[in-house]
UniProtKB/Swiss-Prot annotation:
Keywords assigned: Amino-acid biosynthesis, Aromatic amino acid biosynthesis, Cytoplasm, Transferase
Gene3D superfamilies in alphabetical order: Enolpyruvate transferase domain (3.65.10.10)
UniProt entry tagged with the keyword Cytoplasm: yes
Keyword tRNA-binding part of the UniProt annotation: no
Top enzyme category: transferase
Binding site for 3-phosphoshikimate: 23-24, 28, 169, 171, 315, 342
Protein name, entry field: 3-phosphoshikimate 1-carboxyvinyltransferase
Domain of life according to the entry: Bacteria
Assigned protein family: Belongs to the EPSP synthase family.
Reactions accelerated catalytically: 3-phosphoshikimate + phosphoenolpyruvate = 5-O-(1-carboxyvinyl)-3-phosphoshikimate + phosphate
Amino acid sequence: MKRMKLRTNAGPLQGTIQVPGDKSISHRAVILGAVAKGETRVKGLLKGEDVLSTIQAFRNLGVRIEEKDDQLVIEGQGFQGLTAPCQTLNMGNSGTSMRLIAGLLAGQPFSVKMIGDESLSKRPMDRIVYPLKQMGVEISGETDRQFPPLQLQGNRNLQPITYTLPISSAQVKSAILLAALQAKGTTQVVEKEITRNHTEEMIQQFGGRLIVDGKRITLVGPQQLTAQEITVPGDISSAAFWLVAGLIIPGSELLLKNVGVNPTRTGILEVVEKMGAQIVYEDMNKKEQVTSIRVVYSRLKGTIISGGLIPRLIDELPIIALLATQAQGTTCIKDAQELRVKETDRIQVVTDTLNSMGANIKATADGMIIKGPTVLYGANTSTYGDHRIGMMTAIAALLVKQGQVHLDKEEAIMTSYPTFFKDLERLCHD
């Protein structure tokens, strides 16, 4: 088996980085642009494999999408402009694509089959199947957990529902709201904890109307959307890897440019500041929710991460776990059982990977207990097909002074950050 040899024993990281476009916003720009009336132009779109799966799905649904002058141009014909696909819709590794597009297709008068890769086929879809069934959609997957492939028969006469989310999930909320845009009457979604709100913000940006009152979102349908020009900010989930690298590698100083700082996504910034991180925000644009972040090596202390903070940093928890291995004292992550049904069981995989390198982490049912600081050593590792595990391991390897770190299945990183290793080499000044 050929494994990638990762860079180890790095000196201080120096330089400026522009992280790729935000994955969540990129997906939603394509999805809403595909059903808005008119020509939507998207700048700064992430060209990772997940977003490409969303683009291909809409091409298969009859939407004209092409690249012009570094922009993605989407010729939307409204909700009535989608046509039955001639083939199965393949969502690759993308849970966002499958869940949100299932919600959107709920109101269409045709049937589709949606499949995914091996990893996506192990992710439960019951969380969207049940609310969509209540709205009048025929939808089913495999076993009680409704694993992909999904078979869906849309319904032009969707029923509005009031639905209390049993879990904190922006994807489930989004699937219901996308269906609700096509249902006649008032749909309400009540969240357990407030999750990322890109769908709500972007529905409004495309001319849709909804009311957000704390954890309750109300949308009266049906509605039509109007094409927009969208600029996608840098992805804070991708920036998180450089943020942590800058904090834990002695002598480092990095400037992360144009990072999206939507308040439902900035949990990691609050956590690292509480742990003692030295970070400075430059060129903050509160209206556009973007900033540049200057980060320098810092001495950190352990902390507790739980409750309403978890949905605001769920994707950053693997790299936060690495950060905690270098902090003084104990860090406890709780209420994060959702990590077990991501691209991998991230609680177990993070624990096993970092412990194999010398960390002191105990996995719990809903999180991890991490004792630091610990010295990290070489090991044979894998992404397990999970992009965030791969990038976490590559940053961990930079700290290794003894031994080599080899990484299997590194191609998974293409999902969200195709230029990750190129950027890493640029910041490593030998």
